Swiss-Prot record:
Compartment(s) of residence: Mitochondrion
Miscellaneous notes: This protein may be expected to contain an N-terminal transit peptide but none has been predicted.
Single GO term (MF): glutaminyl-tRNA synthase (glutamine-hydrolyzing) activity
Protein name: Glutamyl-tRNA(Gln) amidotransferase subunit C, mitochondrial
SUPFAM superfamilies in UniProt: Glu-tRNAGln amidotransferase C subunit
Length: 157
């Protein structure tokens, strides 16, 4: 039997006589979290945060043909068109902007499922020999392995 306990990953604004056990019992009864009790109910800033980005036209990305060929081989994507190269260059510029954002004084985020209790199913013991049943789910198999298409290239029928 698994023991499920509620863990709190954020501070709750309460009086000093607050007891965690009382709050856990209250949460179990209510089944809903009262966001007004949290010191920081959201991690989304209430006001815009100024950020200094350089002009994208200043950072012109030049990619040599050897790098383009390597990317085509690794990603199985054709980069011969001008539109594909423009998309690749803008993606690199965007990643460069993100890499230069100052995150020195930014605290890590809480978990997405901060106060939600996840329902767990009961464990069921099986014989464990269900290989044939699992392989029947796949469209294409080879010996005892799944066969998947390599990237965006379809398998021959």
């Amino acid at each position: 039997m698994l023991r499920i306990s509620a863990r709190f990953y954020c501070k709750i604004a309460t009086q000093s006589s607050f007891k965690a056990a009382e709050y856990k019992n209250k949460i179990k009864k209510d089944k809903k979290l009262n966001f007004t009790q949290l010191l920081h109910p959201t991690k989304v800033p209430q006001t815009p945060v100024p950020a200094a980005f350089s002009d994208p036209s200043e950072n012109v990305v030049e990619i040599d043909t050897k790098t383009i060929q390597l990317l085509e081989r690794l990603s199985l994507v054709d980069l011969d068109s001008d539109q594909a190269l423009a998309t690749l260059k803008s993606s690199i510029q965007f990643a460069d902007k993100i890499a230069h954002i100052d995150t020195q004084n930014v605290r890590p985020l809480y978990t997405v499922l901060e106060k939600q209790q996840l329902q767990l199913r009961n464990d069921q013991v099986t014989a464990g020999d269900s290989r044939a049943e699992l392989l029947r789910c796949a469209k294409v198999t080879d010996e005892d392995y799944y066969v998947s298409p390599p990237g965006n290239i379809p398998l021959e029928q």
